[in-house]
Swiss-Prot record:
Organism lineage string: Bacteria, Bacillati, Bacillota, Bacilli, Lactobacillales
The protein's name: Cell cycle protein GpsB
Originating species: Streptococcus suis (strain 05ZYH33)
Cellular compartments annotated: Cytoplasm
Coiled coil: 32-63
Family: Belongs to the GpsB family.
Biased composition range(s): Polar residues: 60-71
Keyword check for Iron-sulfur: no
Chief place of localization: cytoplasm
Entries under HAMAP family matching the protein: GpsB (MF_02011)
Amino acid sequence: MASIKFTTKDIFEQDFKIGFRGYDQDEVNDFLDDIMKDYDAYEAIIKELKGEIARLKAQAANSPKTTLPTEESNDVLRTERPSSATNFDILRRLNRLEKEVFGKQIVQDQE
């Protein structure tokens, strides 16, 4: 996990050297104030998320365990799928055969 290099206090107490044609000191201070506000917001978010993680871990520890499908039940599911597909194929073939057989009988009966 990455470590935090600066705190809001570090940013607040940072001094910059003023050189010839240096940066506007008020502009730098305003920018650093915004950064400090962001750091405070990030710290609050982190604290809130850590609390939520702890709450969810406790909830997970206290909740009943759900069982995951075992290899045996997976095998049963795998064997059921081909049979249902086979049943569908059989019904489709039977339907075609009935149309073929009964269709010819209807034509013969009409003659």
